[in-house]
Amino acid sequence: MPGDSRRIRGPEESQSPLLYVLSEEGGKAAGRRGRGPSEPRPVFVRAGLLSQAKGSAYLEAGSGGTKVLCAVHGPRERGMGGERAETRGRLLCDLRWAPFSRRGPWSGSCPAGPSPRQAGLQLQESLEPAVRLDRYPRAEVIVWVLVLEDRGSALPAAVSCASLALADAGIEMFDLALGCGLSRGPGGELLLDPDDDEEEAGSGGTMSLSLLPTLNQVSGLISSGEWEGESSEEAVRLCMEGCQRLYPVLHQCLVKATKRKIPVPQPDTN
């Protein structure tokens, strides 16, 4: 009997070992770990890891922070649909969380968050404005993202990682799509790139923004909680600044990955 290759094989219930680990202070992981309110976590990225995929990328936010892996397949020809299908390609996104990705019991999706289908649609809406789908008529591009470890701001990390993987696959794009998250602290302070503890301790206000940095255009915006005019404008500004800070890191990673693909010229022995 053929197996389900799309299903994440793992136990129905799982708990991360970090659930039982205490910090040096004897409690949970220590807050911002020295970061300022508007300072994002340092990011490590690498492209071209998976040989089986057309394009791939890995992103890690902070030491022991959120870890995301992405693979891109296609473009592949698909069946005739309608006028839109004939002139424009389609981007399909699958965003899932590994059973061991978070502390606490495994619930089958992101705890207290969207279902895998909803998360995939949110990822798709953030990426579509960056991809030149008109260049791939009657074709589809499949983006598969797995959150290996969720320590906060998983969706923005997935957007950045998927965008890097699309570029690594050679998919024509208008610009990279970069994501950044923000939450409102218990005292009303805006915290850029929050970790999981800060997200849980927040006062009901979170925001996830996707930006095309070169074009300076917002490709996706998701918020929860009540936001007043001035605070929402400040939150959007901080998220855009966070995306702009991330752009040089991904750009440099993409250049290195492209250079690795260029064959080394052999000396002429004649």
Curated annotation (Swiss-Prot):
Kindly give the InterPro entries that the UniProt entry links to this protein. Answer: ExoRNase_PH_dom1, ExoRNase_PH_dom2_sf, PNPase/RNase_PH_dom_sf, Ribosomal_Su5_D2-typ_SF, RNase_PH
Q: Which GO terms describe its cellular component?
A: cytoplasm; exosome (RNase complex); nucleolus
Claim: Cytoplasm is one of the keywords in the record: yes
Q: Where is it localised?
A: Cytoplasm; Nucleus, Nucleolus; Nucleus
GO BP terms, alphabetized: rRNA processing
Q: Which Gene Ontology terms cover its molecular function? A: RNA binding
Q: Give the top-rank taxon of the lineage listed in the UniProt record for this protein.
A: Eukaryota
Annotated keywords: Cytoplasm, Exosome, Nucleus, RNA-binding, rRNA processing
Give the span(s) annotated as Disordered: 23-42
Q: Does the keyword Cytoplasm apply?
A: yes
In terms of one coarse class, where is the protein primarily found? cytoplasm
- According to its UniProt record, what is one Pfam family this protein matches? RNase_PH
Provide the family line.
Answer: Belongs to the RNase PH family.
Subunit structure, as described in the record: Component of the RNA exosome complex.
Purpose: Non-catalytic component of the RNA exosome complex which has 3'->5' exoribonuclease activity and participates in a multitude of cellular RNA processing and degradation events.
Protein name, please? Exosome complex component MTR3
Q: Which organism is it from?
A: Xenopus tropicalis (Western clawed frog)
**Gene that this sequence comes from:** exosc6
